[in-house]
Amino acid sequence: MKLGEFDIQPVTDGRFRLDGGAMFGVVPKVMWERCCQPDDQNRIQLGLNCLLIRIGRKNILLDTGLGDKEDAKFQQMFAIERMPTLRDSLKMEGLQPDDIHMVINTHLHFDHAGGNTVREDGAVVSTFPKAKYIVQRGEYEDAARANERTRASYRRENFTPIAHVDQWEFVDGETEVLPGVTVMVTEGHTRCHQSIKIESEGQVAFYLGDLIPTVSHLPLPYIMGYDLYPLQTLETKRWVLDRALNENWLLVFEHDPRVLMGRVRKDVEGKFYLEEVKP
């Protein structure tokens, strides 16, 4: 779809499942299961919705999904459905890995950066060899020195091979990485999580990452148990949603399995809801 001078298109890396309780934190199951039906292992289905941005001859990719390096045990644990993969989705858009000029990671958890690298001839290498990969410097540092709480989410094979070939470009805070494409720190899920603002001709799209992973997480207290700083998530959500409402932003949801994007509104009780926009 057109957004001013940009063309933006969701590209999927498939679907997977995570524990519903972890996805909704302190929200009781009796409330969250109204919108997200769990399976017999209490897992809910989630999308892997990356975003392709095109302007002129440049192709920018926001997040890279899970990738395909993991073994059968990992795939079973997370009930991964890989039809299609991200590379399949890009191919349907007429693109090969060499055609991607920039990859922006919201953060480096395995379901957002797993497709950064690929296994070839027994080695793990960059999936997009001609791209600059962009992430907050603090996020990379936290991933590189992950602790007992965070280690399961950060898998070194998703980011260290890119450092070996000097494809990383680290940013510190809000940065316009291309004219009209700005990364903004939206801390809470991680210390240096970032979301991406795309702006052209008075129109704005905002790729949320894990700040608001699904439409079901629009209510302010609906915060993931995975978030390292949940009270910061609360405040970040508040200002993002208020600004999105006042400025009519198009919000893009990375993990919703059904709704990809929409514009936030408020009902008579002052609660946020979404008007879906089809891409």
Task: Label the model's feature ranges.
Residues I60-L62, I104, Y133, A205-Y207, ...:
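Residue-level marker for buried hydrophobic side chains located in beta-strands
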Residues D13-R15, T64-G67, L108, G138-E139, ...:
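Active-site metal-binding loops of divalent metal-dependent hydrolases
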Residues K2-I8, T12-E93, S195-D210:
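Conserved beta-strand hairpin/beta-sheet module of binuclear metal-dependent hydrolase folds
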Residues G114-K130:
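Conserved nucleotide-sugar donor-interacting segment of glycosyltransferase catalytic cores
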Residues E81-L95, D99-D111, T127-V185, E235-N248:
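Metallo-beta-lactamase
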Residues C36-Q41, D121-G122, V183-M184:
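Short, P/G- and charge-enriched loop/turn segments at secondary-structure junctions
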Residues M77-D88, E201-P279:
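Cap/insert and terminal regions of metallo-dependent hydrolase folds
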